[in-house]
A protein has these predicted regions:
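Long, Lys/Arg- and hydrophobic-enriched amphipathic alpha-helices
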Residues: 67-191
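A short SAM/SAH-binding and catalytic strip from SAM-dependent methyltransferases
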Residues: 8-39, 81-89, 93, 97-99, ...
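Conserved nucleotide-cofactor-binding alpha/beta core module
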Residues: 1-6
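A mobile, often basic/glycine-rich helix-loop segment
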Residues: 20-72, 118-131
Length: 191
């Protein structure tokens, strides 16, 4: 490309111009904290080392319980809640930039809309693997909670559009017509 890439360290460094942003698998790269309530007590899921220096999951008491109850109402015992404060903070700052300069954003990610549960996973060579093994060799991720993202955007004054699956999004853009056009114009070798 004849256009140089400019790397920014923060949202505040964005120029004061209208924003058109596409975030593809951006939000799922942000850190997520997991919590579980057992017998009415909230605990945070952490990682620790055993005496042989093997990683394992453990649960430690959490003082975050008041916010968890507010965010998720009455949560059944032993259900996992995932909280991504960095995503909410990012959306808040990003919303302010859009409100000030106008613009829009499209975020594409593996996601859900407000469901509870453990979505933490590791992928290596297109296969799911143990997140605590082969450190640094796997893609670690959690599914994005788009309810939290849209709530944060709306709280900060933006309008959030309907959440769509990738399939429906592409169909709405006319992918079927495009595929049919391309197929009609294939030569014999390409078919």
């Amino acid at each position: 490309s004849k256009h140089a890439i400019t790397w920014l360290k923060s949202i505040e460094e964005l120029p004061e111009i209208p924003i058109f942003a596409i975030g593809n698998e951006f939000l799922d790269a942000l850190p997520v904290r997991q919590f579980k309530r057992t017998n009415g007590v909230w605990k945070e899921r952490c990682v620790s080392l055993d005496s042989n220096f093997n990683l394992f999951y453990c649960y430690v008491p959490s003082s975050f319980h008041t916010e968890l109850q507010f965010l998720h109402g009455s949560v059944p015992d032993n259900e996992v809640i995932e909280v991504c404060d960095k995503a909410k903070g990012f959306i808040s700052k990003f919303s302010n930039k859009i409100l000030k300069n106008s613009g829009c954003a499209l975020f594409i990610d593996y996601a859900h809309f407000g469901q509870l549960g453990d979505t933490f996973q590791a992928v290596r060579n297109h296969s799911f693997v143990d997140p605590l093994k082969n450190l640094g060799e796997s893609d670690l991720t959690c599914h994005v909670d788009f309810k939290t993202i849209t709530d944060a955007a709306q709280f900060n004054g933006l309008r959030a559009s309907k959440i769509l699956t990738q399939r429906d999004f592409l169909l709405n853009l006319g992918i079927e017509k495009r595929v049919n056009y391309l197929v009609r114009n294939l030569n014999e070798k390409e078919k």
